Amino acid sequence: MLNSFKLSLQYILPKLWLTRLAGWGASKRAGWLTKLVIDLFVKYYKVDMKEAQKPDTASYRTFNEFFVRPLRDEVRPIDTDPNVLVMPADGVISQLGKIEEDKILQAKGHNYSLEALLAGNYLMADLFRNGTFVTTYLSPRDYHRVHMPCNGILREMIYVPGDLFSVNHLTAQNVPNLFARNERVICLFDTEFGPMAQILVGATIVGSIETVWAGTITPPREGIIKRWTWPAGENDGSVALLKGQEMGRFKLGSTVINLFAPGKVDLVEQLESLSVTKIGQPLAVSTETFVTPDAEPAPLPAEEIEAEHDASPLIDDKKDQV
């Protein structure tokens, strides 16, 4: 009965306005009130502030600053084996496994379309048919920055407008095509393990989705698909990120979906649905053996990232996708 009521609210409540209100409130400096809200949040969700670079809640001017708080480097060591891809986020694995042609498992008895997840981009979908996927849910208590599973060269980013359903166990089991319906940012990378997609999925109360190379992607919420592309390799304007490096963040949190090409990686055997994830721990292993890591690409300076973002053309029409 209670679950039915909660599901009904998902369809009745004005999720967009609630999200805008939450984003507005979380960005405001309210002095003692901000600290009180943070303290209550920490207590209710049992947030481990000892891991944060700034463990004192009084040091955060806004709730958003607290929510995207950086962690101390030593609390998330990155596995250095060149054959290992690491977990991109703190959270819990919702589902994982093989992509069956165009079908991805959402919950027991519920699948959704790979092509729909990728906003109808069938060429991108072809890269991952019969490949591997991992869906990681970030709860409110988790660290909400997202990191790279491996070295990667950014090739494409697509913003897809959509619904703002909550993303949790209840909605995954009961809202059809949940991840293909919600707002999301799709990031496609070239890696030594083949193409990899890392998808940041929005939800109710997720105030914004950001990337390190382009800043805030949403809001504003304009209701149109947007697409950006970047050059390959070491060409001028390329964006290179290292294994374990931050690539994005949620202000209030949601879900990360990783897609890997067929035959390129095997997921770590002990991982299963509801496994706890920590950034830097093994997620998958290459099906090939790398004796030594390839030369690591140098991270792009911040000013060049900003310049590239300003120069990248926007394509606002769905039909212009490749």
Curated annotation (Swiss-Prot):
Its EC number is 4.1.1.65. Its cofactor is pyruvate. One of its GO terms (biological process) is phosphatidylethanolamine biosynthetic process. It catalyses: a 1,2-diacyl-sn-glycero-3-phospho-L-serine + H(+) = a 1,2-diacyl-sn-glycero-3-phosphoethanolamine + CO2. Residues 308-322 have a biased composition (Basic and acidic residues). It is found in: Cell membrane. InterPro entries: PS_Dcarbxylase, PSD-B, PSD_type1_pro. Is synthesized initially as an inactive proenzyme. Formation of the active enzyme involves a self-maturation process in which the active site pyruvoyl group is generated from an internal serine residue via an autocatalytic post-translational modification. Two non-identical subunits are generated from the proenzyme in this reaction, and the pyruvate is formed at the N-terminus of the alpha chain, which is derived from the carboxyl end of the proenzyme. It is a peripheral membrane protein. GO terms for cellular component: plasma membrane. Residues 293-322 are annotated as: Disordered. The record marks G253, S254 as: Cleavage (non-hydrolytic). The keyword Transmembrane helix does not apply. GO terms for molecular function: phosphatidylserine decarboxylase activity. Pathway: Phospholipid metabolism; phosphatidylethanolamine biosynthesis; phosphatidylethanolamine from CDP-diacylglycerol: step 2/2. It comes from the Bacteria. Its main location: membrane. The modification Pyruvic acid (Ser) is found at S254. The active site is at D90, H147, S254. Pfam families: PS_Dcarbxylase (PF02666). Binds 1 pyruvoyl group covalently per subunit. Signal peptide: none annotated. Belongs to the phosphatidylserine decarboxylase family. PSD-B subfamily. Prokaryotic type I sub-subfamily. Catalyzes the formation of phosphatidylethanolamine (PtdEtn) from phosphatidylserine (PtdSer). Heterodimer of a large membrane-associated beta subunit and a small pyruvoyl-containing alpha subunit. This is Phosphatidylserine decarboxylase proenzyme. It comes from Escherichia coli O127:H6 (strain E2348/69 / EPEC).
